[in-house]
A protein has these predicted regions:
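Non-catalytic structural scaffold of enzyme domains
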Residues: 6-292
Length: 292
């Protein structure tokens, strides 16, 4: 089962709703899971999807390096593309960089954090797992979420070093083996006297790209909590619902742009995958890691 975190929730918009430009930012292609939900929620919007593949994976950076990298890249992206709102579609970055970004830029930033609270509410066995990157697992922010919202649950924090890269490879046309994927998700599944894990939080936006394989390979059925629908609803809260679509009935998918800061992994299979998601235009805006 998959869960929409804010299903049924209605908000009053606090910004104008006329064809906004939305920048979706991630270290790689994981944020495409968020982009897809945003495109459904605001099909009239003008989208820029920015993948900082020159800095991927963010887990290799220290906290100070990560903050400096994201702020520097965001400086250039905002200058070039002038978005009305930015979505940081990356858990690892969101847990650190939202305060400095909000302080530096006078536009709204929507972040992505582990969905521990809804997972705890959904669990019947009171056993949940948070499947994340090592960086997200190590953050005090993540542990504070567990202590605050899941104190009554047995929580397994799983920091996978390989899943984000496996998800990238999947879209680039070089999928990893089932054995590799299973080895990364297996620690999520606890089975003891208190019962089995019944909810797994996908605390990296890359991971839903592999969700069909997770569901097939899991040792037993669980609820997988994907943050993307909730992020889209938060954006609609800020921007409002679309006033109307184009008079000719077409949306703005043909105007959406995918930007890569490195481009080494932009293969033909990836271009096809981007095009299938409404990102037919691809640009390389070189921002080497050492020079960001």
């Amino acid at each position: 089962m998959r869960v929409d975190l804010l299903a049924g929730t209605v908000y009053a918009p606090c910004m104008g709703s006329e064809a906004p430009k939305i920048l979706v930012f991630d270290s790689g292609v994981g944020g495409l899971t968020v982009f897809s939900e945003l495109a459904k929620a605001r099909p009239d919007a003008r989208f820029v999807y920015a993948a900082d593949d020159a800095g991927f994976p963010y887990g290799r950076l220290t906290e100070d390096e990560l903050v400096a990298r994201v702020v520097a890249v965001m400086d250039r992206l905002i200058e070039r593309h002038a978005p009305d709102l930015v979505v940081i579609a990356c858990h690892t970055a969101s847990t650190l960089v939202l305060p400095p970004l909000r302080q530096r830029f006078p536009i709204p930033f929507v972040g992505t954090v582990p969905a521990v609270k809804p997972a705890a509410a959904l669990s019947r066995s009171r056993r949940i797992a948070v499947l994340a990157t090592p960086g997200t697992v190590a953050r005090d922010y993540t542990r504070d979420l567990v202590e605050t919202y899941a104190a009554g649950c047995a929580v397994t924090l799983v920091g996978s070093r390989r899943l984000a890269a496996l998800a990238e490879a999947e879209l680039m046309g070089a999928p990893g083996s089932d054995e590799d994927v299973l080895a990364e998700i297996a620690p999520c599944f606890a089975d003891g006297e208190g019962g089995r894990t019944d909810v797994v939080v996908l605390a990296c936006t890359h991971y839903p790209l592999l969700l069909p394989r997770f569901e097939r390979l899991a040792p037993w059925p669980v609820t997988w909590v994907d943050p993307a629908p909730a992020i889209a609803r938060r954006v609609v809260q800020l921007l409002g619902a679309p006033a109307d679509l184009r008079a000719d009935g077409e949306d703005r998918e043909d105007e959406a742009l995918a930007v890569f800061t490195g481009g080494a992994g932009v293969t033909e299979p990836l271009r096809r995958a981007l095009g299938a998601r409404g990102l037919a235009r691809v640009a390389i805006e070189s921002m080497p890691l050492a020079q960001a």
